[in-house]
Swiss-Prot record:
Primary role: Responsible for synthesis of pseudouridine from uracil-13 in transfer RNAs.
Protein name: tRNA pseudouridine synthase D
Residues the entry annotates as binding substrate: 27, 129, 329
Source lineage: Bacteria, Pseudomonadati, Pseudomonadota, Gammaproteobacteria, Enterobacterales
Active-site residues annotated for this sequence: 80
Source species: Pectobacterium atrosepticum (strain SCRI 1043 / ATCC BAA-672) (Erwinia carotovora subsp. atroseptica)
Gene: truD
Amino acid sequence: MENSEQLVWLHGEPQATGSLKSTAEDFLVVEDLGFQPDGDGEQVLVRVRKRGCNTQFVAEMLAKFARLPLRAVSYAGLKDRHAVTEQWFCLHMPGKETPDFSSLELEGCDVLEVIRHRRKLRIGTLRGNHFALVLRQVSDRNEVDARLAQIAASGVPNYFGSQRFGRNGNNLEQARLWANNDIRVKERSKRSFYLSASRSAMFNQVASARLAGQQAKTVLCGDALQLTGRGSWFVAKADELETLQVRLDAGELQITAPLPGDDELGTQDDALAFEEQALTGQETLWSLVKRERVEPARRAVLLYPQQMQWEWQDDVTVAVKFWLPAGSFATSVVREVLHSQQDIDIGA
């Protein structure tokens, strides 16, 4: 399900409106690697603050400056150009001197830190991101205040943002054409985008159905449950439901929904039947990820922002800060707060 307006809200549809982003400075994203760089090694980590530049462009410029092939430059996640972001890039430079990046001139970008590291930075290496947003022209301060408090206590749906599906859902449109053999997709990056969009749409559809049935916080027989903060999961057995529900309520466990691939969904019994029913209508996308032998995975249905705080600058402007784990979308938080005049989706 790619249209965010069709997705169910956890706290009911917001009544307030506002502007998510008037300037790039109203959307600040700072990467959290989750580890301290080693200080030595074959890799050179470069922390860059960028405005108006997308991740791939900066990677290309760093490669050119350091006289490296583009394949020698990596990063942990993509960041949108319509924001101020602090992001790490990794340059593979064995046996080479660390470049003097003080002479790098790139409009909208500043090098903040350079340090050696032993391991390559790869997609998904990231622990999470710190977000600092400013919501302006808020129509109802009391409503937004109450919803922010609800979110801090109870979380939000862990939906993929519309950015995942491309402009006007183009990635999904192309994925369906590809699935039906109406087009050929040779570029590896496009194949990845289309497959990712397909799985994300199916996840959103199952997660939304779970919320619609008031079952986002109720363990079903056969559910795939994730240990909070961990990627591993296990299947809920019928004789364990009461105990598992207590652990879920205590925050130790999270219910997951599928990122379908070429194998089974992972759930069993009641949960499997629910997910298969929820995926009705997505046969084309499901057949594509099976055909392309994509590895299946699971993702938590709910997202719990950490370190959440907010401060009103005046009656119509609120600054909101929080931390999200890698792969989560800040706009999944914002869509539970208010209807935004601009839908800027920045995840990592």
